[in-house]
Amino acid sequence: MHVSTSSVPVAIGRLTLLAFGFALAGCQSLSKVKEPVAEPTPAPPVIQSPLATHQFQFDAATDAVVGELQVTKVEGEDTFSDIARRFNLGYEELVRANPGIDPWLPGEGREVVLPTQYVLPNAPHEGLVINLAQLRVFYFPKVAEGEPTTVITHPIGIGKVGWSTPEGSTKVVSKTKNPTWFPPASVRKEHREAGDPLPSKVPPGPDNPLGTHMMTLGWPSYLIHGTNKPYGVGMRSSHGCIRFYPEDIAQLYDDIPIGTKITVVNQPLVLGWHRDAMYLQAFPVLEDDQREHPSGADAVLKAGISDEMWQRVKAHSAQVDLQLVNHLVDKPLGIAVPVSRRGVTVDKFLYASRHVENRLPEGANWNGKEELLVSEEQFEAARSGVILPKPEAPKKAVKAPVKKAPAAAPTAKTAQVAKPPPVEKSFDVERATPVKKVTGGSAQPAGQR
């Protein structure tokens, strides 16, 4: 076949144009494939009423998690201490759950996580169960046969480093309203050396660190009591005793009979089943806890999951997210998170939680009234276990003597009836104010606080 040489350039040109057209079409197709599909903007969460999270009923045969996670927004000049008390949380609970936020200046409008969902400690559901790592107490009152299990939970303050609260079992030995405090020699020595000497006896009243209610334990020198410094609850601030908010100890006082069993554990990692998933709640290891704790997901699951819980995981065709477990253990937020539910991340779980108004929940123990204003210096001293020296009493002002002008010669007007010299009045506060004796209080055995 003969092809004219003059037609070759024309054919080549046509082929080139055709190829160029295909190339353009291909680029357009490629660009369409590469375009990311914009995810729909999630709807803003519905703001609901806050929940009071201190008393729950649950089925102990199937559940080991109570409460519900909540998120609120900072209002006005709120600090973490204000928000914590409002929602029956401890200060450290809020700090852990909200890393990177200034607890004194969180910023108006900023979202704050309220860790108001709790995995119950691995201990018998009987009497008072205290988890030191959790800085929280769980009270299981006796219920009639066939009724659901009830648990009451509150934040607590525990012994600071060097004055740690012991672990083990004991019981309530006695109860006292409006107790008198006799500071033990060790505590008086510590305060004296810090420039804050204590009296040998502190009567009931606003200056009494035991607060208005006290329970003595089978352990000598250790107490459960209220406090005159509520901001110290939810942290390591005591000399080994267990501190409650005033409103919380007042509620529990009448409900807890003498002889109630007390179990104190120290569990930084707690696992529990709730509905369709296994939850993990991780807390920082206490500074003076020298034990070796599991650090990897495999070790955590091996140490914390019972055969019964494994059977539940299998029954729900669930799979534990090892990456999520490692994340929670490495960065313990103190938030109960489901680790056997597909597609869960901490951020997604927080977003899906209950967003609430920043106000006192219905049914809360606290009445919302502050008893004591505290400075940041006082607060941080309590948190770090430092005793501030007692402030010096203001010195009395001494008036400089005034030189009197020489007396003028009496005149007809002044030479009348002489007035008596003015009498200087003195006011003895101690004598002028009647002292009211307080009865009904009693001393505790060489207790700390």
Where are these regions (language model features)?
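Primarily a LysM-type cell-wall glycan-binding module
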Residues: T53-N88
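Loop/turn positions that initiate beta-strands
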Residues: E77, G107-V112, G259-I262
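Intrinsically disordered, low-complexity Ser/Thr-rich linker and spacer segments
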Residues: F58-T62, E68, T116-L132, W273-H274
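Exported/periplasmic cell-wall-interacting domains
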Residues: P36-V37, V187-A407, K419-V423, Q444, ...
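C-terminal motif of bacterial Sec signal peptides marking the signal peptidase cleavage site
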Residues: A23-G26
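Bacterial N-terminal signal peptides that target proteins for export
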Residues: H2-T16
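LysM (lysin motif) carbohydrate-binding repeats in extracellular/periplasmic proteins that recognize
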Residues: L30-S31, V37, E75-L105, T149
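N-terminal post-signal-peptidase region of extra-cytosolic proteins
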Residues: G76, E92-G100, R110-E126, I152-G159, ...
